[in-house]
Amino acid sequence: MAAESFELIAELREFTGKSAARRMRRFEDKVPGTVYGAGKAPQSITLLQKDLLKALESESTFSSILTLKVGDKKQKVILKALQRHHTKPKIVHIDFQRIKASEKLIMNVPLHFLGEDDCPGVEAGGVVSHLQSEVEIRCLPADLPEYIEVDLSHLQLDESVHLSNLKLPAGVGLTSAVDEEHDSPIASVHMPRVSKADVEAEAAEAALAKEAATEAAEEEETEKPASEAEASGEAEQADTDKKE
């Protein structure tokens, strides 16, 4: 699936430097950024924090061709670097790279795992582990996929899917060489490991349940004679009343 195109609106940044960027973030709720590449001079820009945060809610923003409108001019870019605030849900700085239709670009694209809930390994009690969540690819802008699907529906217990198993779209290649010695696993299925703490907790829970059942049985036995005595007394009283 080809990546969608999103449009972001930015303004040229007149003042640069840490102090100017700090004031901009604090008083104007704007994010400083830079646009570079394609043989053109870098541009210092600003974007509204709220618009940028909304765009970043979509996973596609990170692996798509973006349209960046600066003033009255539009340019095709990709999101190249993002710096987040360490305690607040805010963006501190962002970098965009211009692209050319004739030049290949390098991007990290997310992996979407399919069929894992119904694979034989899971049905046998195994658990799927995602060892990689994205891969780095090289392709022309027109061939950039939004994500790459990984079919796990065939996985048996103790089996893995490797980079060499990926079905890449036409025109898309991995940046890393893949051979017998360099073929990283991206997902696997194994039986869940039970830790010592889990075993001890399960044993303690079973002991408590057994103790509770024993106490309930003892209480039942204690109440039973009293109930029988009451029933016997009622019967004797009934016989006495009958004779009278």
From Swiss-Prot:
Q: Which domain of life is it from?
A: Bacteria
Pfam family of this protein, just one? Ribosomal_TL5_C
This protein's GO cellular component annotations are:
cytosolic large ribosomal subunit
GO terms for molecular function, please? Answer: 5S rRNA binding; structural constituent of ribosome
Instruction: Give the compositionally biased regions (Low complexity).
Output: 204-215
Ribonucleoprotein is among the record's keywords: yes
InterPro entries on file: Rbsml_bL25/Gln-tRNA_synth_N, Ribosomal_bL25/Gln-tRNA_synth, Ribosomal_bL25_b-dom, Ribosomal_bL25_C, Ribosomal_bL25_long, Ribosomal_L25_dom, Ribosomal_uL5_bac-type
Keywords, A to Z, come to: Ribonucleoprotein, Ribosomal protein, RNA-binding, rRNA-binding
Q: Quick check: keyword Ribonucleoprotein in the entry?
A: yes
Where is the stretch described as Disordered? 197-244
Q: Which GO terms describe its biological process?
A: translation
Family statement: Belongs to the bacterial ribosomal protein bL25 family. CTC subfamily.
- PANTHER family according to UniProt: RIBOSOMAL PROTEIN L25/GLN-TRNA SYNTHETASE, ANTI-CODON-BINDING DOMAIN-CONTAINING PROTEIN, RIBOSOMAL PROTEIN L25_GLN-TRNA SYNTHETASE, ANTI-CODON-BINDING DOMAIN-CONTAINING PROTEIN
Listed under subunit, the entry gives: Part of the 50S ribosomal subunit; part of the 5S rRNA/L5/L18/L25 subcomplex. Contacts the 5S rRNA. Binds to the 5S rRNA independently of L5 and L18.
Described by its record, this protein's role is as follows: This is one of the proteins that binds to the 5S RNA in the ribosome where it forms part of the central protuberance.
Protein name as annotated: Large ribosomal subunit protein bL25
Q: Which source organism?
A: Coxiella burnetii (strain RSA 493 / Nine Mile phase I)
Gene label: rplY
